[in-house]
Amino acid sequence: MEINATTLWRDILAVRTKAPLVHNITNYVVMNSTANALLSIGASPVMAHAEEEVIDMVTIAGSLVINIGTLSKAWVAAMHKAMKKAHELQKPIVFDPVGAGATPYRTQTILELIHETPPSIIRGNSSEIKALVEAGIKTKGVDSTESSESAIEAAKHLSQKYGAVICISGATDHILNQEEYVRVENGHPMMTKVTGLGCTATAVVAAFAAINPSMMEATAHGMAAMGIAGEIAAKNVAGPGSLQVNFLDTLYSLSEADVHSHLKICA
Amino acid sequence: MEINATTLWRDILAVRTKAPLVHNITNYVVMNSTANALLSIGASPVMAHAEEEVIDMVTIAGSLVINIGTLSKAWVAAMHKAMKKAHELQKPIVFDPVGAGATPYRTQTILELIHETPPSIIRGNSSEIKALVEAGIKTKGVDSTESSESAIEAAKHLSQKYGAVICISGATDHILNQEEYVRVENGHPMMTKVTGLGCTATAVVAAFAAINPSMMEATAHGMAAMGIAGEIAAKNVAGPGSLQVNFLDTLYSLSEADVHSHLKICA
Amino acid sequence: MEINATTLWRDILAVRTKAPLVHNITNYVVMNSTANALLSIGASPVMAHAEEEVIDMVTIAGSLVINIGTLSKAWVAAMHKAMKKAHELQKPIVFDPVGAGATPYRTQTILELIHETPPSIIRGNSSEIKALVEAGIKTKGVDSTESSESAIEAAKHLSQKYGAVICISGATDHILNQEEYVRVENGHPMMTKVTGLGCTATAVVAAFAAINPSMMEATAHGMAAMGIAGEIAAKNVAGPGSLQVNFLDTLYSLSEADVHSHLKICA
């Protein structure tokens, strides 16, 4: 594992050059903003959830995003199918357990999905990561109220159980698997006031996972690109509305100098 | 009932401090923009519509938004469930009858929903409010073509029948229950060129309803906050695109001085 | 057929004055941005997909958009119903075959829909247009990787088979029916980095089709309005985020002078 400004910039260029197709089965709230972020970073997004086509779609994709933000029965069936096929084809599956712990249905559905087909990467906030390990944890909706540090033990447990890279996002992003650990310190507090930037991070990680076989590197690179773009975009903005606009502009125009001067990573 | 710049500012601070969880069962068009507006005003949005989880979700929420903009069968069943549970737990239900009168299915579905569980607050434009009272009224899609004044009699009737606060939004917002009446004169004509700002108003009202037990005060405060933010945001914008961005920035940064200098209310 | 800056400006004014109701059965990703573009150009958008109401909705609409971007069974049934009713009432149907060729389900569903009820206009990128003619064509997701020229033969074939106007959009837009051919050269490369601007073009064409009985003129006017607005909007933007915002502002404020100085059409 090698993660630094040079490897990050190399992988940003690879995403821009290869424009990997990222297949998203994601929630209604973030479909538009996620697609725009994927286009801005240089990937090619597709959103498709019909049971009749998810297998064919994941077959031509470079990676698969599963985000359970606005669940319902038919979609869960499609998620199972797409995950199985991605696993069979050894394509990265990046899983976002939005609101885990908020309702029993949500937590149980997630556990069934990841138990049947272990994802390559799971990215959530601390409440969500903890809810997947401790039954009955109290979650307040979809926004986390706890520090990301508090979920590190739960993340280690999850990683061991599913063999996945776990990313706890927050002021600090903690990324780990069974042997390795990376901390990304980029980002800006106002990012929590733009809906779905967590979901966007998951999708951006999937773009990097489509072009780099190391899931640790892909996760760290994706989270760092998000954090750096958010940090630069937040300079001199008047609020979350302009942050969202600047964020896409910044992702699109991220330069080697931006990466080298802003990356705060501890590998 | 007391509604003035001081009470409005007090309640804006309360929303920012308490960050109430607002559970939205709303339409696809506005999910993203509504969630962003709720975050900007300081609330915590959650969108969830699965029959399997709406009861649990509304149980942890501070208020419930029901918006029938993009109806279908499964969603209506979830709306019924969520409304019943909210009523049982005495949590405010804010109802948005989008496009009432446009099709018989829409009008009938709304009437069934509010007949079974009367909402705390109903917010619509004049065509929608009238369509809920007069059968066969001619509605042109989801945008109103009539003045808000023309629906006051219908609103009084609705309020009596369901015991709800009714808000007719438009150039002037008329807010009434069986005993009280308030008029809010804030806002800007260009707001009608941004999709879903009516739906957003409903959700913002729900944020205030989660922290103030007076539904009249909550409705007036929510509509006034929307109108003031829209008015300030519309200054010097080039069109609806920048209005939408500035609107979120302004909601986020609304100050005591903004409230005192802009509020145009007649209580 | 007459298509030039004078006729384009005349039809922009007609859309602004008549504010035609455009009924969209479209995909989740673009609902918000499409509705905003329709409002900015001066039309009145409505999104409705319930089988129980699509017939009533299309009856009061000026035109119908069918966009299969995020397909599923229940929606396809509603599309069939709405298309049949629109055809019966002689209202323009504008069809967007998003991602045709990406999966067999997608291609087959499109062919079934347009075989049962031929649309008035089909707008797609070159891969999509070709996929509707040549079985087994290789499509990479929803973004086209080929020039629009390469699909002209396929477009002619489609036009003959279904009696529809075909628009192949790209750097150059090719618009044709069995007798006529128009080329629109407006637009900007960065428009491909904003999600759903193709879908938006389809909806804007539907706004023009609601006020001009010539489907060739409506398509050319719609595509030209999109291209001119995109071109003006792209001046001095920092990236796709601000392009999206400027694009709406520009559509809203498009002037006679803008149209006359920018239109690049070959009729």
From Swiss-Prot, chains A, B, C:
Pfam families: HK (PF02110)
A single GO molecular function term of this UniProt record: ATP binding
Reactions catalysed, as given in the entry: 5-(2-hydroxyethyl)-4-methylthiazole + ATP = 4-methyl-5-(2-phosphooxyethyl)-thiazole + ADP + H(+)
Binding annotation for substrate: M47, G196
Keyword terms, alphabetized: ATP-binding, Kinase, Magnesium, Metal-binding, Nucleotide-binding, Thiamine biosynthesis, Transferase
Pathway the protein contributes to: Cofactor biosynthesis; thiamine diphosphate biosynthesis; 4-methyl-5-(2-phosphoethyl)-thiazole from 5-(2-hydroxyethyl)-4-methylthiazole: step 1/1
UniProt record, GO biological process: thiamine biosynthetic process; thiamine diphosphate biosynthetic process
EC number of this enzyme: 2.7.1.50
Ligand binding (ATP): R123, S169
Main function: Catalyzes the phosphorylation of the hydroxyl group of 4-methyl-5-beta-hydroxyethylthiazole (THZ).
Name of the protein described by the UniProt record: Hydroxyethylthiazole kinase
